[in-house]
Structures are given as structure tokens and as C-alpha cells.
Amino acid sequence: MLFLNAKFIDLDLGESAVIVNEEDLKGTSYYPQDRVLIESHAGSVIGNIYSTKTMVQKGEVGMLVSELSEISISEGEEVKLRHAEKPESIPFIKKKMDGQVLNPHEIRTIIDEIVSKKLSNIELSAFVSSTYINGMNMDEISEMTKRIAETGDMISWEKSLVVDIHSIGGVPGNKYALLSIPILAAAGITVPKTSSRAITSPAGTADVMEVLTNVELKEEEIKRIVKTTNGCLAWGGGVNLAPADDIIINVERPVSIDPQPQLLASVMAKKIATGIKYTVIDIPVGKGVKIKNEAEGAKLARKFIELGEMLNIKVECVLTYGGQPLGRAIGPALEAKEAIESLQDPKNAPKSLIEKSLSLAGILLELGGAAQIGEGQNLAWEILESGKALEKFNQIIVEQGGTPKKPEEIELGEYVEEILAPIDGYITDISNTAITNVVKEAGAPRDKKAGILLNSKIGNKVTQGDVLYTIYSGSEERLISAVNLARRVYPVKVEGMLIERISKF
């Protein structure tokens, strides 16, 4: 056991950790990455040891400010370190790595130890990787979904009809929710939309909405806002909804993987936690997104519907075209700007964005009884064209703590580079993967001002020297890096009518 004095360090390592001077570790049974229990007079917390020569002095232990909510302690107070017990779930993770089926107790233990931070990021990564490689059956996924939901707050509603739209993502510029949610809310449908931040895309719905208003809302705030406006657009992590899911997402993000068992559990756990009874799941299909073809999409849709039946949630899935970005704007600020422009003037908005937003809203207008079967999309258009959706969107922004903005008031990256067409021809391909990578290289989603604005879409004719797209960034260095990447990966491809001249064989 070690007795050391606490020193607060403003550092976030993404996991529970303690920092110890290497001199204090010499001659002991404690080594870097050992799991230890740090105890004070008022509680305890588990962390992994990181050693240092200079960050803390001999006799001190560095306590991360990001973890202090777990333990009541004063700086300089003496604490004791001792070895923590090995997590119970380690053998269960190994079992899944071997491709075996986990029982309910094993799944619940893994999720519980994720939330209690007994698992290191390395151990959690092993679990995520094992489900990515070996998958899970529907009973495992159902159990994992329920336990993820149970680890956080559960919101209940007075109304019995509470609906939601969710996209599994993967499509750059997928800002449909900023149109669909206010359309539904304007029709009197209760739609408490909670979203994650970006995992594999350059901007999640929460990242885009955060450009315009506060998205970190507590349960009481969500209830108040929804009671006033019928809807909200909030970040799920701010409400303590399914906290295990957010911890898992933070491990998935660096390697841009989203294992299907986690995808299913993540989506449906949030529906349980927010009291959703009806949901439409958008499954984009195409090159460069999570689902490559319609057969894969139909298979995933069946799993969502089956999981919904197991959880008593009515699920309807739609396969949507995901072969190129939705609309022309990619990146938080650019997407927020395009969404407002589309709400203000839908007739001149990108057709792909309008069609998708109306289609998804229309289904729930029908399920919610606001429209007859087959008439939902028409009603959605009437609400959008009349300006009622814009009015409702602005009301939601205000209730969440923001101020409605005009499109031109949204600040974009001050460092800008236009990419020009090298030849006369037609846009033959826009790579979702390349677009995503370039926008991330420019700084998104952390840099809200970073992104790409497309001037043309697939099939459009261009002339040599025309602007194909514009890259924005809040950093000159990040812009240069993004431009260099764009010149290597060609996010937008232009080809002439003459593909190849062949004179000999």
C-alpha cells in the first residue's frame, strides 16, 4: 500500500488514471498500467497507474480533475493506493473474443463494469473488437440493450404516443433531423430527439445543433422543452441517458468502427431511455457508408424490427440512398447554415435533403395519426412550405438556450481553399469516405467551422476551372493538411465523355 498526497491535474486521458512519480514505484509491487484503488476519508475510485519523472513530485499522486466527481477529496490530502481487484468481466470478454455466446449475467456484468470504470480503455477496446469480429445473437443484443438503458436516467412521458427518427449514419451532411423534427413538432407530434456526437462522420446531429443552441440538457429541461414545443434536439450524453453507450462510443471513435451489435444496442437503448414507443430507423445504403447494398440493409432492418419487438417498441425501417453526401454542406457550421436556408426557402434547397426529410417525417405523421396512410409526405411539405417548421425550429432553439440566427450570421472557417475542375466533363463520383476524411482533416467535428461545401453533385456538368468544392477550416495548418489530402484522394471525380482511346490490340 502507498500513502501519497493528492495533487489535482487538469488533464483528461479518456479513462480513470492516477499519475505517480517513478521514484515512489521503485522497490514496490506497483507498475505502470496496474489497476489501483485510491481511497480517501470520503470514498474511493479506481484508476490505472501512469508514471512520471516531473509531472508530480515524489510523495504526490496526480488526480485527474475530470475524475474528481467520483471521489470527495481536497488537494494535498493524504490518500492511500492499493491494488484493485481484477474486474469480474475480464473472463467474459475473453469468452466473446473466442466467439462464444454470453449469458445475461455476463453481459450485464460487462456493462456495469464499463459504467463503474472498472475496465480500462484497453480492456473495453478488446470487448468492442470482439463484438466487431464475432458478432452477437439477438438474445445477447437484447440483454445488452436493456442493461445499457438501465445504467442511466429513464425518461417517462404523460403522453402514450412518443416518436423518434434515427439514422445509423455514415452519410456526410446527414442533417435531415433539423428539418424533420420541427415538421413533426409543428404537427403536434411529441418527438424528443436525442442524438450522439459524430462517430464515423464529420458531424453528428448534436454537433450541428450545437452551432445554434445548447444541446447538453438535463432530464427536467428536456421535459420542459418538449412540453412547450413538442420536440427537442439534444445530445444524449448530456442527459445521462445510457452512459455506457457514450463510454463505448469514445473507444470506437479513434478507429472509426461501429460494430453492428453495438449499433443496434446503442440506437435502441436510447429509445428505451427516452420513453420512445414508435421509431423510424433510417438505413443509408451505398458506397462509402456502413451498409453497402440493399440486401445488407434489409438484413439489418429485420434485426432492428426484431429487437424492437423484444423491447416493446414499434420499429419501421427505411433504406435510403447514401451513395453521396446529403445536400451540399458537410461539417457542423455549414450543415447548420444549410438546414436554416432549407427551412426558410425549401423550394430552392437541395432536393436530396428535402426529399429525405419529408419522407422520414411523413412516415411518423402517418404512424402518429396526423395524416392518412400515403398522405404523410404531402402534409410534411405543407408544414415546411408554410414556414411553420421554421417557426417551430426557432422556438426549439430559444427553449434550449440559444438565439435564432440568419444563415449569414453563422461563422465559417476563416481559412478557405477552392478546389477547381481539372478538365471539362461530368461529376462521376463523390466519395463519402474521402469527403469524410478531408473534412475531419480540416478539423471537424471539434472545429465547428471546418467543412466542405460542394458546388456540384454526381451527374452535373462542369467546365475546366469551375469550383468543385470549397474547404473551410478554423486553422491554417489544418486547412493545408486537408487540401493536401484532397489532392491525393480526389473526393470529387470529373471525367470527360471520352474515357479511353484504343488504336491497337
Curated annotation (Swiss-Prot):
Catalytic residues (positions): D258 (proton donor)
E.C. number(s) listed in UniProt: 2.4.2.57
MF term (GO), any: pentosyltransferase activity
Gene Ontology cellular component list: cytosol
Top-level lineage group: Archaea
Name of a matching Pfam family: PYNP_C
Catalytic activity of the protein: AMP + phosphate = alpha-D-ribose 1,5-bisphosphate + adenine; CMP + phosphate = cytosine + alpha-D-ribose 1,5-bisphosphate; UMP + phosphate = alpha-D-ribose 1,5-bisphosphate + uracil
Gene Ontology biological process: AMP catabolic process; pyrimidine deoxyribonucleoside metabolic process; pyrimidine nucleobase metabolic process
InterPro entries: AMP_phosphorylase, Glycosyl_Trfase_fam3, Glycosyl_Trfase_fam3_N_dom, Glycosyl_Trfase_fam3_N_dom_sf, Nuc_phospho_transferase, PYNP-like_C_sf, PYNP_C, Pyrmidine_PPase_CS
Keyword field contains Iron-sulfur: no
SUPFAM superfamilies, alphabetized: Nucleoside phosphorylase/phosphoribosyltransferase catalytic domain (SSF52418), Nucleoside phosphorylase/phosphoribosyltransferase N-terminal domain (SSF47648), Pyrimidine nucleoside phosphorylase C-terminal domain (SSF54680)
UniProt keyword terms in alphabetical order: Glycosyltransferase, Transferase
Extent of the signal sequence: none
Residues at which AMP binds: G170, S196, R197, A198, I199, T200, S201, T205, S266, K290
Record keyword Heme present: no
Function of the protein: Catalyzes the conversion of AMP and phosphate to adenine and ribose 1,5-bisphosphate (R15P). Exhibits phosphorylase activity toward CMP and UMP in addition to AMP. Functions in an archaeal AMP degradation pathway, together with R15P isomerase and RubisCO.
PANTHER family (UniProt xref): THYMIDINE PHOSPHORYLASE (PTHR10515:SF0)
Family named by the database record: Belongs to the thymidine/pyrimidine-nucleoside phosphorylase family. Type 2 subfamily.
Family matches, as NCBIfam families: AMP_phos (TIGR03327), ARCH_P_rylase (TIGR02645), PRK04350.1 (NF003338)
Protein's recorded name: AMP phosphorylase
Lineage, top ranks: Archaea, Methanobacteriati, Methanobacteriota, Methanomada group, Methanococci
